[in-house]
C-alpha cells in the first residue's frame, strides 16, 4: 500500500538474514502463507532468491506489488521460483485518478498490464483497492473491472490513517454501514444493492439522490444503470472481501447468519497478531502493516520468542476491549479494527471509530460462529484420508487447514464416500474454483 512506500533501503534485511527469518518462521509453523510486499518488492534484486528459499520450505508464497515492474519476464520468474500468484494495487477504474493517488504517471497502465501477464503465465491474482472518500463511488465499477480482468479476489481496503494515509479523508461510520451492506448484497446476501447505498453514492457524486426517471420512478436506476445495479461476486469466480473493516462480518451475520461468507478466525475476525504479522524491511515485527507497534526486532530476538512472548501479541490474542467494542455481542465475530483504534486513540484496545453499531441492538448475548466457519480451527479427522490426500493437505496454509478438512469431509459424506482420496480432492478443487492451489 502507498502508505508505506519509500525509496530508502538502508538497514534492510540482507538475503542471508531473510533466509534465517524464513527458517525461524518455519520452526514455529512450517505451512505459512507468505506475502512478499513493500514498498515495491520487485526493486529487490534478491526477491526471487528469497521466494525460492521459502517455497522450498513449503511456504505458500505470493507477491504484493503495484504492478508497474511486473512484466512477462517477472511473471515467468515468479512461476519458476515457486510463487503462486500476486496481489495488484488498483485504486481507481480511471487511469488519471489512480496515477494521481499513486504519484506515478503510468501506474494504472502498469497495474492492468501486470494482470494480463500473470494470466498469460497461468498465475492467479487479486486486486486491492484502498477505499477513501475520493474513490468510494467507484466501488461498483471496480467490481465490474475486476471481473473483466479475471481477478480471483477483489479486496477493498478501508482506510487506516497511518503513514501517508494520515493526510487522506475517511468516510464516516454511517457510510461504512451502507457500503459494507452493498458489498454483502453484491455477493448474494439479500436482494441486490440496497437503494440507500445507491442514493449515498449518487449524493457523493453531486447528483440528486431523489432524481426520478420515466423508466424508473423509484429513482434507483436513474443513478445506477447496468452493470451498477447487477449483483456480482462469487457466481463468476470473484470473491469480494472487505479488509480493515471487521464489522463487515457483523453486517453479513445480520443479513444472513448462515452466510458462507462468514469465514472467520478462531480468535476473532481480524488475524493481526493472532495468525498474521508484518516483518518490516528493517526486521521489526508488528501485528499488521497499519499498526506501528513493534513486538521486537529479529536482529535481537528470534521469531519464536517474539511470536510467543511479545506483550502486544498477548493483548491482541486475549483482548480486553474498551468502549462499544468491549460491550458488543459481535466482539467474537468482529472485534473492531485494532489498527484504526490505535491510529485514532493511541490505544489498540479502544473501540473502532468507524463502526456505527450500538451494542445490544441484536439482543446482547455474545455471538460465536461454529467451528466449521472458523479459520485457525484445529484439524480433526472424522473420515479416513489416504496418504496421498494427507500429503496434498499439507500444502494448504495451516490457518485454513482445519476448516478445509471439515468442508472436504462434508463434501465426501454428501457423495457417500468414506475415504478422502486425491481424486476426491481434485473434485473439491473444481467445485471451489481453484482458490486453494496445493503444489503437486
Positions of PLM-derived features:
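Radical SAM enzyme [4Fe-4S]-AdoMet core and its adjacent flexible, acidic
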Residues: 6-8, 81, 89-91, 96-271, ...
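Conserved, mostly hydrophobic/aromatic
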Residues: 36, 54, 63, 88, ...
Amino acid at each position: 500500500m502507498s502508505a508505506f512506500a519509500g525509496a530508502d533501503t538502508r538497514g534492510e534485511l540482507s538475503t542471508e538474514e531473510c533466509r534465517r527469518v524464513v527458517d525461524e518462521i518455519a520452526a514455529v509453523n512450517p505451512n505459512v502463507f507468505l506475502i512478499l510486499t513493500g514498498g515495491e518488492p520487485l526493486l529487490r534484486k534478491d526477491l526471487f532468491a528469497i521466494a525460492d528459499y521459502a517455497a522450498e520450505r513449503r511456504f505458500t508464497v505470493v507477491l504484493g506489488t503495484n504492478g508497474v515492474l511486473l512484466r512477462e519476464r517477472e511473471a515467468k520468474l515468479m512461476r519458476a521460483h515457486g510463487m503462486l500468484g500476486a496481489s495488484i494495487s488498483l485504486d481507481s477504474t480511471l487511469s488519471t485518478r489512480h496515477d494521481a493517488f499513486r504519484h506515478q504517471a503510468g501506474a494504472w497502465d502498469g497495474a492492468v498490464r501486470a494482470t494480463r501477464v500473470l494470466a498469460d503465465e497461468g498465475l492467479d491474482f487479486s486486486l486491492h483497492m484502498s477505499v477513501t472518500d475520493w474513490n468510494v463511488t467507484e466501488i461498483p465499477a471496480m467490481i465490474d473491472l475486476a471481473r473483466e480482468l479475471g481477478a480471483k479476489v477483489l479486496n477493498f481496503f478501508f482506510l487506516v490513517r497511518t503513514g501517508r494515509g494520515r493526510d487522506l479523508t475517511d468516510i464516516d461510520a454511517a457510510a461504512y454501514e451502507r457500503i459494507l451492506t452493498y458489498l454483502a448484497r453484491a455477493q448474494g446476501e439479500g436482494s441486490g444493492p440496497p437503494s440507500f447505498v445507491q442514493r449515498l453514492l449518487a449524493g457523493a457524486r453531486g447528483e440528486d439522490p431523489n432524481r426520478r426517471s420515466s423508466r424508473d420512478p423509484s429513482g434507483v436506476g436513474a443513478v445506477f444503470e447496468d452493470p451498477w445495479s447487477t449483483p456480482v461476486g462469487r457466481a463468476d469466480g470473484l470473491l469480494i472481501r472487505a479488509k480493515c473493516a471487521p464489522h463487515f462480518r457483523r453486517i453479513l451475520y445480520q443479513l444472513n447468519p448462515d452466510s458462507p461468507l462468514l469465514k472467520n478466525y478462531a480468535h476473532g475476525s481480524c488475524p493481526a497478531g493472532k495468525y498474521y504479522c508484518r516483518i518490516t524491511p528493517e526486521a521489526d515485527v508488528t501485528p499488521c502493516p497499519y499498526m506501528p507497534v513493534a513486538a521486537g526486532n529479529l536482529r535481537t530476538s528470534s521469531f519464536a520468542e517474539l511470536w510467543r512472548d511479545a506483550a502486544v501479541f498477548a493483548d491482541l490474542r486475549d483482548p480486553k476491549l474498551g468502549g462499544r467494542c468491549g460491550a458488543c455481542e459481535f466482539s467474537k465475530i468482529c472485534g473492531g479494527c485494532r489498527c484504526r483504534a490505535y491510529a485514532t486513540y493511541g490505544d489498540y484496545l479502544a473501540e473502532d471509530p468507524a463502526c456505527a453499531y450500538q451494542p445490544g441492538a441484536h439482543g446482547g448475548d455474545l455471538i460465536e460462529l461454529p467451528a466449521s466457519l472458523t479459520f485457525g480451527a484445529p484439524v480433526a479427522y472424522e473420515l479416513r484420508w489416504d496418504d496421498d490426500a494427507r500429503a496434498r493437505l499439507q500444502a494448504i496454509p495451516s490457518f485454513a487447514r482445519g476448516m478445509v478438512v471439515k468442508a472436504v469431509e462434508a463434501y465426501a459424506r454428501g457423495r457417500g464416500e468414506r475415504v478422502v482420496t486425491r481424486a476426491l480432492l481434485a473434485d473439491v478443487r473444481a467445485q471451489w474454483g481453484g482458490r486453494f492451489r496445493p503444489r503437486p
